[in-house]
Design a protein with these regions (language model features):
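N-terminal charged helix/coil linker that caps or initiates catalytic domains
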Residues: 1-50, 270
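Glycine-rich phosphate-binding loop and adjoining beta1-alpha1-beta2 segment
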Residues: 11-14, 75-113
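Conserved N-terminal Rossmann-fold NAD(P)-binding element of oxidoreductases
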Residues: 51-53, 76
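Hydrophobic/small residue at the entry helix of a nucleotide-binding pocket
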Residues: 57-58
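Conserved S-adenosyl-L-methionine
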Residues: 67-72
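A structured beta-alpha segment of the ubiquitous adenosine-cofactor-binding alpha/beta core
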Residues: 98, 102-152
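E1/E1-like adenylate-forming module used to activate ubiquitin-like modifiers
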Residues: 139-243, 278-290
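Mid-domain beta-loop-alpha active-site segment that forms a flexible
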Residues: 239-259
């Protein structure tokens, strides 16, 4: 029987003078008048953002959003920090080995300014918690573990039922690339993208299907045999430590563009399309179709 984890709730005291002083450097890029700048910043301030998975990308995004002026977060992650996380994850350290990732990230985020509201789901996203986590969110980021299927489907179903949540991002790093998968109420649902039953066991065939659908493009190096060894044999996703900060920047920028409605931002393709930035070849592109059907 699983131990029931207690949820931590942070409720900060809002100080208007402190808030506007701490986000002051944002404002010059947000409008042509002080009124326009503040109205756009207020959209970010008042948004409720859910981050499902607070590892290498999600944890860093949570802290960046607080610095940018977001005041309302919901964080979920069932995992505990281990030694291998120190290579890339915000909050991972020898001191925090064995501690819940969402709890550590929430603690760090709250300590930055103490004027924010954070709900922590240390049990992560489950069939039972998905709708409660989604409730009240304007945007949700799916940064859950690569091998999650059933609970990921539950989160996406909760999104499609939500009247408030506008869209979801799923942004994995693959080698030296960052992929941006966008889900809306009208996009292809993730169950159709994956084409895997929610109760499927993680067999080599299922793992290869996940690789195909989450990693649309791969470089020739390293070879497929080595990737199969990691993903299929060891059931572990390799992540190059320099890449999560790239994903963090892209993710936070896209969130800001959408939430603040910054003039000039383009709409990225929704699933089954995607956007990708590759730091190895220094290229970026938009893909508008189901890549696996080619």
């Amino acid at each position: 029987m699983l131990q029931k984890l207690e949820r931590t709730i942070y409720r900060g005291e809002y100080n208007s003078d402190l808030y506007w002083e701490r986000v002051d450097r944002n404002l010059g890029w947000l409008g042509n008048s002080e009124k326009e700048q503040k109205e756009r910043q207020e959209k970010l301030r008042d948004a409720v953002i859910g981050i499902a998975g607070t590892g290498g990308i999600g944890g860093a995004v949570a802290l960046r959003l607080i610095r940018m002026g977001v005041r309302n977060l919901k964080l979920a992650d069932p995992d505990q920090f281990d030694i291998t996380n120190i290579q890339r994850q915000m909050g991972a350290s020898l001191v925090n080995v064995g501690r819940n990732k969402a709890e550590v990230v929430a603690e760090m985020a709250y300590e930055l300014t103490k004027d924010v509201n954070i709900d922590v789901f240390p049990e992560g996203i489950t069939m039972e918690s998905a709708e409660e986590f989604m409730d009240g969110c304007d945007v949700v980021m799916d940064q859950m573990d690569f091998f999650q299927i059933r609970n990921r489907y539950a989160l996406h179903r909760a999104f499609r039922k939500s009247d408030r949540c506008r869209f979801m991002f799923k942004i994995p790093t693959v080698g030296h690339s960052v992929f941006v998968f966008t889900y809306t109420k009208d996009s292809m649902p993730i169950e159709e993208v994956y084409g895997i039953p929610e109760n499927a066991d993680i067999t080599p065939e299922v793992t290869r299907r996940l690789m195909e659908r989450i990693m649309p493009e791969l470089h020739e190096f390293p070879g497929q045999d080595m990737l199969d060894h990691w993903f299929v044999d060891m059931e572990r996703m390799p992540i190059f430590g320099a890449c999560p900060p790239l994903a963090e920047g892209i993710l936070v920028e896209r969130l800001a563009h959408e939430i603040m409605d910054i003039p000039g931002h383009i709409k990225l393709p929704v699933q089954p399309g995607y956007a990708v930035f590759d730091s190895l070849t220094w290229t970026a592109k938009l893909v508008e179709k189901a890549w696996w059907a080619e």
